[in-house]
Curated annotation (Swiss-Prot):
The gene is rdgC. GO terms for biological process: DNA recombination; regulation of DNA recombination. One of its GO terms (cellular component) is bacterial nucleoid. Belongs to the RdgC family. It comes from Shewanella sp. (strain MR-4). Keywords: Cytoplasm, DNA recombination. This is Recombination-associated protein RdgC. The keyword Transferase does not apply.
C-alpha cells in the first residue's frame, strides 16, 4: 500500500463527494477477470487489496482507491509467423495476392484463436484523493497509467475536473537554483544524485550518482547553460525521493523508522494495521505536498 511514485493532479473545483457516494459510483465499474475472448479488462478493485472489502478506504477525509488491469499476453512474433503462414498458404492455393483488408481479417482470426490459451498479467494502480489540498496523487511512474485511472474515475463520477500539477515557475529553474545554492529549502535536503540537461534541443544530458553535488565538476555544467531536471532529495527523516522537472516524484521511499511508527499495533489484526499505516502515509504525503508547493514557489493559478 505504501506509495512508490507520485504523478500529481489538482482539482479545478472542490472535490466534495462523500465516501459512501464515491463507493456507490465506483461499484458500477468494478474489475472482473478476462473471459476467454477478452484481450484486457480494467476496473476498480478493493482499495486495500485482499485484506480489504471496499472500493474506497477513507481516513481523515482522505480517500484511497485502486484499479486493476488484466491483459492477455499475445507474443507479436507468434502472431506474425502464424499470419505469414496462412497468407502464404492462401496465396499459393488461390494464385493471387491477398489485400490488406483480408490480411487484417486473418490476423483477427488468429488472435481470436490464441486468446483462450494466452497467459495474462495483472497490474494495480492506486490513487489518493486529498480534498483538503484539492489534489489527486497517483502511485505510478507512468503518466499513461495515471490517465487511465483518472479516465475511469471520470466515467464513474460523470465528471472529474483535474489537471496536472503545475507551478508558477518551471520546476527545473528551482532545482537549478538549489544546486547553485548548495542546498534545498528546508525541510528538504539534497542527496547525491542529479540529472542535468541542456536547454538547447541538441544539447547533452549529464547524470551524477553517488557524487557530492557541490563539487566544481558538477557546478561547471550549470555555467554552460544546463539545468537540473532530476534531483534526489530527502524530506525530513521520513521520505527519500527523486523530484523531476515535470513535477512528478519517482522512487518514493518511506524510511524504515517512519514505517515502524505503528509497530506497537503488531500484525494480529491486519486490517487495523493497514488502516493505521494508511493514516500515517496519508498525513505524511499531505505534509510533503505542502512543503513541495512552498519550496517550488506556489502553484500556477487555475482558470475557473
Amino acid at each position: 500500500m505504501w506509495f512508490k511514485n507520485l504523478t500529481l493532479y489538482r482539482f479545478n473545483k472542490p472535490f466534495s463527494i462523500e465516501t459512501e457516494a464515491l463507493e456507490t459510483a465506483l461499484a458500477d465499474f468494478t474489475f472482473s477477470p478476462c473471459g476467454s475472448q477478452d484481450v484486457s479488462k480494467f476496473g476498480f478493485s478493493n482499495a486495500l487489496g485482499k485484506q480489504g472489502s471496499t472500493l474506497v478506504h477513507s481516513a481523515n477525509n482522505r480517500h484511497l482507491i485502486c484499479v486493476t488491469k488484466e491483459e492477455k499476453i499475445l507474443p507479436g512474433q507468434v502472431i506474425k509467423e502464424s499470419l505469414e503462414e496462412k497468407v502464404a498458404l492462401i496465396e499459393d492455393e488461390e494464385n493471387r495476392k491477398l489485400a490488406k483488408k483480408e490480411k487484417d481479417a486473418l490476423k483477427d482470426e488468429i488472435i481470436t484463436s490464441l486468446l483462450p490459451r494466452a497467459f495474462s498479467r495483472r497490474s494495480q494502480t492506486r490513487a489518493l484523493i486529498l480534498p483538503e489540498l484539492e489534489m489527486i496523487l497517483v502511485d505510478s511512474s507512468s503518466a499513461t497509467k495515471a490517465e487511465e485511472l483518472l479516465a475511469l474515475l471520470r466515467k464513474a463520477l460523470g465528471s472529474l475536473p483535474v489537471i496536472p500539477l503545475s507551478f508558477k515557475a518551471p520546476v527545473e529553474s528551482n532545482l537549478t537554483q538549489w544546486l547553485k545554492d548548495g542546498s534545498a529549502p528546508l525541510p528538504f535536503e539534497m542527496q547525491d544524485e542529479a540529472e542535468l540537461k541542456s536547454a538547447a534541443d541538441e544539447g547533452g544530458i549529464v547524470r551524477f550518482k553517488q557524487q557530492d553535488l557541490k563539487e566544481d565538476e558538477v557546478l561547471a555544467h550549470l555555467e554552460t547553460g544546463k539545468e537540473v531536471h532530476k534531483l534526489a532529495l530527502h524530506f525530513g527523516q521520513s521520505i527519500a525521493l527523486l523530484l523531476q522537472s515535470d513535477a512528478s516524484v519517482k522512487r518514493l521511499k518511506f524510511s524504515e523508522e517512519f514505517r515502524a511508527g505503528n509497530d506497537e499495533l503488531g500484525n494480529e489484526d491486519p486490517m487495523a494495521r493497514l488502516d493505521a499505516d494508511f493514516a500515517l502515509m496519508g498525513s505524511e504525503l499531505v505534509a510533503l505536498m505542502h512543503a513541495l508547493v512552498s519550496a517550488l514557489g506556489g502553484l500556477e493559478e487555475t482558470q475557473a
